[in-house]
């Protein structure tokens, strides 16, 4: 019987290599086809194929709105409760009374927090633009508060116009000794809200990988496919980038909460991989989000905030401007606009709006405003491109499913 069993197994062993060869060739052809489809999707941008891109963008927008409408209808009880609460808040907001002072205070704080949370989400999600709202919004805001604190000798800026505009307090009795901790306390709320927004923006990779692992379906996401390939070839990783990604994956998988906390606390471009890793290995949601929130909104934000405040302290800025003047040949011409900009900022701090002594616009501030405008426009364009590419992916997936059913 053993001999007969061996004879029965022999033909299977002979067919094994052919099956493997056929399977590997099928996998390679499928991989090549997916790569070609991905390249075709990436070519779908406004500056190359404007009409098709806009058409796909509007179609994807319609599909997304339809999906969200259906989801809201499925949760109509929660939606109804939300509408009732919103109506009650609107009623309290519109009725005159002694409570209006508290309502206006809560409204101001809520809108201020929502603004920074939204910027944090945009910075974390980015939609492929590399839009980092810390460099464009939060960093300059902290720098402005730091420069104003040293110039005014106080952080008790009049509200209004703060935070829309920073003006020194007229009452000299409000002046105090400025310390690092004083400035950090002044900008703590907006910094923590921005950090919380970046933590919320890390959730999509986590949920995508978790859903793919639990359902066993292929999400056709480039980052997730790269993650799976990295796991398959983890033993043969040679280059520095692959080893760094594997180190992050091992830390998150083995250390758990504190590994995620360490990755979230240190500025690094590989944290998206931590979200995918946590989702793939089914790490509990609150373990992932709790560690991410503490790391990004508290630890990392205090590191970044401290760096900006120290960099823009009065004596550091003055030394930097003086060093610019030392550059041979062009030092004096480069130093002049920086000195004019700092002088204009000091004048603006001591001249509230409407005093008539408005300082002339510095070309540095003009350039910065135009850079921000260009970044925002590029972000909007990239949203259109991204949604058009999502619709193209829908068409390709539909084509795959039709071919499988034939």
Curated annotation (Swiss-Prot):
Its main location: endoplasmic reticulum. The keyword NADP does not apply. GO terms for biological process: autophagosome assembly; autophagy; Golgi organization; lipoprotein transport. Disruption phenotype: Mutants show larval lethality around 9 days post fertilization and defects in autophagy. They also have lipoprotein accumulation in the intestine and liver. It is found in: Endoplasmic reticulum-Golgi intermediate compartment membrane; Cell membrane; Vacuole membrane; Endoplasmic reticulum membrane. Residues 1-34 are annotated as: Disordered. The chain crosses the membrane at residues 78-98, 110-130, 251-271, 274-294, 307-327, 364-384. Residues 10-21 have a biased composition (Basic and acidic residues). Residues 1-77, 131-250, 295-306, 385-406 are cytoplasmic. GO terms for cellular component: endomembrane system; endoplasmic reticulum; endoplasmic reticulum membrane; endoplasmic reticulum-Golgi intermediate compartment membrane; membrane; plasma membrane; vacuolar membrane. Residues 99-109, 272-273, 328-363 are extracellular. GO terms for molecular function: phospholipid scramblase activity. It is a multi-pass membrane protein. Keywords: Cell membrane, Endoplasmic reticulum, Lipid transport, Membrane, Transmembrane, Transmembrane helix, Transport, Vacuole. It catalyses: a 1,2-diacyl-sn-glycero-3-phospho-L-serine(in) = a 1,2-diacyl-sn-glycero-3-phospho-L-serine(out); cholesterol(in) = cholesterol(out); a 1,2-diacyl-sn-glycero-3-phosphocholine(in) = a 1,2-diacyl-sn-glycero-3-phosphocholine(out); a 1,2-diacyl-sn-glycero-3-phosphoethanolamine(in) = a 1,2-diacyl-sn-glycero-3-phosphoethanolamine(out). Residues 173-316 are annotated as: VTT domain. The VTT domain was previously called the SNARE-assoc domain. As there is no evidence that this domain associates with SNARE proteins, it was renamed as VMP1, TMEM41, and TVP38 (VTT) domain. Phospholipid scramblase involved in lipid homeostasis and membrane dynamics processes. Has phospholipid scramblase activity toward cholesterol and phosphatidylserine, as well as phosphatidylethanolamine and phosphatidylcholine. Required for autophagosome formation: participates in early stages of autophagosome biogenesis at the endoplasmic reticulum (ER) membrane by reequilibrating the leaflets of the ER as lipids are extracted by atg2 (atg2a or atg2b) to mediate autophagosome assembly. Belongs to the VMP1 family. This is Vacuole membrane protein 1. It comes from Danio rerio (Zebrafish). The gene is vmp1.
